[in-house]
Amino acid sequence: MAEILIHSTSSTVIPSVDPHQVTEVDLPFRIMKLLDESHPIIHKEPVHWQFGVNPDPKRMHDVMIENMVYHRGLGLSANQIGMPVKVFAMRVDDSDNAIVCFNPKIIKESDETVMMKEGCLSYPELYLNVKRPQAIEGTYQNADGDEINVHFEGLAARIFHHEMDHMEGNTFLNRVSRVFLQSARRKQKKLLRKGRQNGRTD
């Protein structure tokens, strides 16, 4: 398992829900529609979250966690569910801990990089080999507006880095070559076609 160092104790225990069984009625917060790559919000840089102006950051925190769980993601950005603000949720390890990052920033990236296959909720069945830093140092505000400093390694660094792409109006498509993307798109079409034939809807 990849080592993950977290210089923060402000994580949230993810509710124990089975995403295969949950319905909107079971969740205490409204589930938002997941936007796919065709929506312009995905490709536009979100605006900063303004504490004292934007409504109820603690409710926003909970909505982000619930939607990440419902949509079965390792991370989820607010613009992926129709809210163009710089906020994302992410799992910080392979247990039930998660954080919600308001106005996140990357301060430093390691020179060491890792190539790894990853996906994105807004691009169903598309998997790309993406090179990202092995470790990052970052900062974000929690729901109380406090600034939190973090150091992530391994998978957590990759998730934070992936979600930061969304914070700039970019996606993981911007990190691969056109030739590789064309090949991955062909595989995506086959997987989507197979899913429809098998009656899958997710």
Labelled PLM ranges:
Residues M1-D202:
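Positively charged
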